[in-house]
């Protein structure tokens, strides 16, 4: 609990989880999320904690973690450190390293929040599978780049056949990218039928989100994101 910063899980009847908590936060969804946690290739967040440690932990520890995440989601009281992103700047080829705006910025969130969003991702995928038409492809499960190229070709032929302009809008919001306007994100989720309590969990962390840059002189001060 000291590492994760999660609230104490309660075992009394008054704290019995509701159906949406049962559906989203359970041991099975946690273990599926932990499969993405690997020893290498995952930079630690600002707290330095590696999610793969929870993957290696015994079952009773994972069960306790799930209970604490459920409690945090129920109260909308997530660890404050989950809202702080570690920012690393990587030079681009041929660009000056003295101009920070010319560098690529990599945002690393704490692994606790990463695991939590991976558990919530299944609910977002459920809504996406219901709303996205079967003819639309792209980077979706069981769909490859060839299908995406074929879809674009068919749309071009459709416009040519009809002799009219044809517009298609694609929004990729699945990765919680920093460039996504949050107000737009919340509105889209509401229109598509995402559980508002799930959106509230994401919003609770996003509303107080900040960043700290890793520099040659140590970590910078926090700035709001």
Language model features with spans:
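Conserved pre-catalytic core of RNA-dependent polymerases
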Residues: 3-225
């Amino acid at each position: 609990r000291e590492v994760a910063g999660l609230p104490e899980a309660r075992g009394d009847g008054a704290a019995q989880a509701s159906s949406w908590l049962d559906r989203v936060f359970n041991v099975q969804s946690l273990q599926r999320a932990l499969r993405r946690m690997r020893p290498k290739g995952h930079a630690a967040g600002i707290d330095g904690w590696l999610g793969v440690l929870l993957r290696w932990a015994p079952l009773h520890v994972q069960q306790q973690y799930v209970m604490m995440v459920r409690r945090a989601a129920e109260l909308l009281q997530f660890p404050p450190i989950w809202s702080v992103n570690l920012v690393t700047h990587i030079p681009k080829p041929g660009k000056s390293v003295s101009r920070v705006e010319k560098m690529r910025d990599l945002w690393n969130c704490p692994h606790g929040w990463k695991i939590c969003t991976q558990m919530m991702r299944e609910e977002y995928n459920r809504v996406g599978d219901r709303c996205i038409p079967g003819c639309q492809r792209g980077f979706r499960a069981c769909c490859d780049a060839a299908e995406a190229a074929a879809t674009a070709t068919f749309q071009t032929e459709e416009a040519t056949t009809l002799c009219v302009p044809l517009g298609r809008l694609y929004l990729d919001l699945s990765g919680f990218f920093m460039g996504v306007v949050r107000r737009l994100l919340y509105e889209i989720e509401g229109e598509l039928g995402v559980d508002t309590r799930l959106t509230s969990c994401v919003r609770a962390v996003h509303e107080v989100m900040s960043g700290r840059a890793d520099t040659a002189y140590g970590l910078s001060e926090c700035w709001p994101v």
